[in-house]
């Protein structure tokens, strides 16, 4: 049973929690994270979701993703999801999420890191992750164009966002 903290529109804890799978009431919001891991060559680590996964089964996705559990910060959730799904440890101390997207049911923080990871270092979570690989910007675009990658609206800017230090290019 997965339990989430509920937030208000200002991203403040409400003191209430929610059980995953139950319908959120209007105005109830929760925190989701995505992690984008780039290697030293500038390639993005992506994962293929299991064929029986709820929501986007058998699609390629970003490095790791999930909901923050009760009591977790965005950083803690990001570190935990990477460890659970990919079997590697990351330390996001001293960093901030690259950006946060506000969606109908909450807030989605996107973390970007560069880490020298080898595919042989990964231990994939069998229940959620079918495969993992590194891709270039061009390979990611090909997966998006073929309908094999979850169609995030910002996908064509992902590699630009990786190096961005301001809101301007």
Curated annotation (Swiss-Prot):
This is Uncharacterized Nudix hydrolase lmo0368. It comes from Listeria monocytogenes serovar 1/2a (strain ATCC BAA-679 / EGD-e). The keyword Hydrolase applies. A motif (Nudix box) lies at residues 65-87. Keywords: Hydrolase, Magnesium, Metal-binding. The keyword ATP-binding does not apply. Its EC number is 3.6.-.-. The lineage of its organism: Bacteria, Bacillati, Bacillota, Bacilli, Bacillales. GO terms for molecular function: hydrolase activity; metal ion binding.
